[in-house]
Design a protein with these regions (language model features):
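A juxtamembrane structural motif centered on a specific transmembrane helix
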Residues: 2-17, 338-393
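N-terminal membrane topogenic signal
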Residues: 22-39
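Hydrophobic alpha-helical transmembrane segments of multi-pass inner membrane proteins, especially
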Residues: 35-248, 284, 288-348, 373-377, ...
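Re-entrant/interfacial helical elements at transmembrane boundaries that shape
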Residues: 183-184, 267-274, 305, 347-355, ...
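Residue-level "hotspot" positions that anchor or transmit function at local structural transition points
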Residues: 243, 277-278, 369
């Protein structure tokens, strides 16, 4: 009798019941604990590193961490189905915030410029950076769209996803904020691969992007071109840029090398950082501070924690049971890992300085809270898995 009643239920209700059963029986046994642990480790390491140079900011960062954990607790308790249902609305609201940043007649008291960039909306005593949260809402929107196989198998479908992705990218570039904008392309490629897009379609898009990338150089801001020029000059051994356009990169490499294997310690590291005059040492260049204070061991710890976060996210996607959950997890993992890759690469002189922050580690309330909300989404997906694999869920 029970079987007959169960089979007579609508398919969506049977799927929901299967999901709820899995959530209640194995809610505490899933891979999302690995990203949670890695995120907590990175957050605490970041607070300690910030305290090396700016003790007052370390206290504020701890407060941001508490807010992030509370928000994560709320989001993680929600079912991922409402995230799929409202994904496009959340994305549209975030895009509207990005447009609002570029409206010329909005007073500086509301949209607060910093170093010539309009990235922050003033909310009382705090500043909110929409580009941090749009990364998550974009992943949710793309996952909601790409979960249907018909979308990704056609070249027109791939082009449509690229056009949608170009909207937040263009708005972020106009702020200007090149570092955040460059994350979307590789993350979209990974999500398309996970969704089952044809390799020849992705190869065509990748080739076009590689051909057009050098053509964008003349359209970059002057400081962005200077950073690229400085990298090439340093690679060629031209030290004349070390006191000019390559000053920040040179100081970062010098400080990172000063830590040696085990680090210089808090007092000596603080002195080295002070006299080397490293710009943005608590935000963009926090990895240099970690390498200086804790040496190669600290740098490796950042990489291990970052890789652990990405691996845990990919495992959540592999075991999600739904295409939506798989794509969200893969998108989140690739976004966070790529950000870590670019930040550490620019700090040790392998990539041009872009101003990209180190996830969970760099000082900043918007970034830290948004990243913890993102981690909570992984937790929601992992703790409410569907039995088998359901393309429609």
């Amino acid at each position: 009798m029970t079987v007959l009643v169960s089979n007579s239920l609508p398919r969506s209700l049977r799927r929901e019941r299967a999901t709820d059963t899995r959530a209640s029986s194995r809610a505490w046994m899933h891979w999302a604990w690995l990203p949670v642990a890695a995120a907590l480790g990175l957050s605490l390491l970041g607070i300690a590193a910030i305290g090396t140079t700016e003790p007052g900011l370390a206290s504020r960062q701890f407060g941001f961490l508490m807010v992030g954990l509370m928000m994560a607790g709320f989001v993680g308790a929600q079912h991922w189905r409402w995230m799929r249902r409202w994904a496009w609305l959340l994305f549209a609201v975030n895009v509207a915030c990005l447009v609002f940043l570029l409206v010329p007649f909005v007073p500086d008291a509301v949209v607060r410029p910093r170093n010539g960039a309009r990235r922050w909306i003033n909310v009382g005593s705090l500043d909110f950076q929409p580009s941090e949260l749009v990364k998550l809402t974009w992943v949710l929107a793309m996952a909601a769209w790409l979960r249907t196989t018909a979308t990704v198998k056609r070249f027109e479908g791939v082009l449509a996803t690229i056009l949608v992705t170009a909207v937040p990218m263009a708005l972020i570039l106009l702020q200007p904020d090149l570092d955040s904008a460059v994350l979307f392309g590789p993350a979209l490629l990974v999500m398309l691969l996970a969704a089952g897009a044809r390799l020849r379609h992705l190869a065509i898009v990748a080739c076009i992007a590689l051909v057009l990338a050098p053509c964008s150089y003349p359209f970059l801001q002057k400081h962005q071109r200077d950073r690229i020029d400085a990298l090439f000059a340093q690679v060629m051994g031209d030290t004349r840029v070390n006191d000019g356009i390559g000053f920040q990169a040179n100081r970062a490499v010098t400080l990172a090398a000063a830590g040696g294997v085990a680090g210089a310690g808090k007092e000596e590291a603080g002195t080295l950082i002070h006299y080397n005059r490293l710009p943005e040492e608590h935000t963009d260049m926090i990895f240099a501070v970690i390498a200086c204070r804790w040496g190669m061991l600290g740098a490796v710890a950042v990489w291990v924690l970052g890789a652990g976060y990405a691996f845990g996210a990919f495992m959540v996607g592999l075991r999600a049971g739904t295409m939506f959950g798989r794509l969200v997890a893969v998108g989140i993992g690739s976004m966070v890992f790529l950000q870590l890759l670019v930040n550490t690469g620019m700090t040790i002189g392998l990539l041009p300085v872009t101003g990209m922050t180190l996830p969970f580690v760099s000082y900043g309330g918007s970034s830290l809270v948004a990243l913890w909300i993102t981690t909570a989404v992984l937790f929601s997906i992992a703790s409410r898995r569907v039995r088998g694999f359901d393309l429609d869920a």
